[in-house]
């Protein structure tokens, strides 16, 4: 509602959807929204557009909300294809598990470094199922590269680290890991319990990785179509993902 009210007088092209902006800015504030739209207007003028187009807003979102600036640095073609599959995999698993949840996905890296990102709406896991869905989505990048190229994704270390942290939270809140095995003397977990927890966590991570792989295998056409879209356009918004998925049905 805030976004709709703020944009009511903006000269927007027909391809601009309010829902795209809302989903791409999960923590929207009036100040940030104003900065995004001011930059989008400048982009529009610079590009010679009659109205503010979706591409103008997308570029502004990348620069303002995600601090991703354009770079002249070229990425190796084969490496870019793997990056595109990695980010597409995050988006595909997110959309399959929770349709409409992915707001923006891009292969543009930060500070000229190869990479990309996929970001969803401002959602908070309400239960264990939703929490494990988030972990599954986090592991999807590595699974996607393995599925399509049959190699280990060396760019996935940050994802694995994030998934590991999420599983620590899962054990504490959902798996009872925070309630047993405490040594009374210094209020710390026993070595036996730590080893037990690590074994549970590793097994669960493996299970969720295989789950992500299976989802991608079953939606391979969608995955490859999103990869193609990223290679062609660099960045996709929620409506783009919806159109791609519809075309794959």
Model-identified regions with their sequence ranges:
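Conserved C-terminal "switch" segment of AAA+ ATPases
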Residues: 1-56, 140-146, 173-183
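Substrate-recognition/cap regions that form aromatic- and gly/pro-loop-enriched pockets
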Residues: 74
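Soluble catalytic regions of large protease machineries
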Residues: 78-85, 91-249
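Short hydrophobic/aromatic residue motifs in ordered secondary structure
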Residues: 32, 89-90
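C-terminal accessory region of SF2 helicases/translocases
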Residues: 66, 70-71
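Conserved RecA-like P-loop NTPase ATPase core
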Residues: 3, 29, 40, 57, ...
């Amino acid at each position: 509602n805030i976004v709709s009210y703020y944009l009511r007088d903006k000269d927007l092209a027909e391809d601009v959807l309010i829902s795209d902006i809302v989903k791409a800015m999960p923590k929207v504030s009036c100040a940030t929204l104003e900065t995004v739209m001011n930059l989008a207007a400048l982009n529009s003028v610079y590009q010679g557009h009659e109205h503010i187009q979706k591409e103008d807003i997308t570029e502004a979102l990348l620069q303002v909300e995600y601090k991703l600036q354009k770079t002249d640095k070229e990425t190796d073609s084969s490496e870019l294809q793997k990056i595109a599959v990695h980010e597409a995999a995050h988006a595909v698993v997110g959309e399959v598990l929770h349709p409409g949840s992915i707001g923006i996905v891009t292969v543009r890296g930060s500070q000229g470094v190869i990479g990309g990102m996929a970001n969803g709406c401002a959602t908070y896991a309400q239960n264990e199922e939703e929490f494990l869905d988030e972990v599954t989505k986090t592991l999807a990048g590595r699974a996607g590269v393995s599925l399509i190229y049959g190699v280990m994704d060396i760019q996935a270390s940050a994802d694995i680290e994030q998934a590991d942290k999420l599983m620590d939270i899962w054990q504490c809140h959902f798996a009872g890991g925070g309630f047993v095995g405490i040594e009374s003397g210094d209020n710390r977990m026993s070595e036996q319990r730590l080893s037990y927890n690590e074994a549970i966590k590793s097994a669960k991570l493996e299970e969720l990785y295989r789950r992500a792989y299976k989802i991608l295998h079953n939606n391979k056409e969608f995955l490859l179509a999103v990869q193609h879209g990223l290679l062609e356009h660099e960045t996709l918004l929620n409506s783009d993902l919806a159109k791609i998925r519809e075309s794959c049905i």
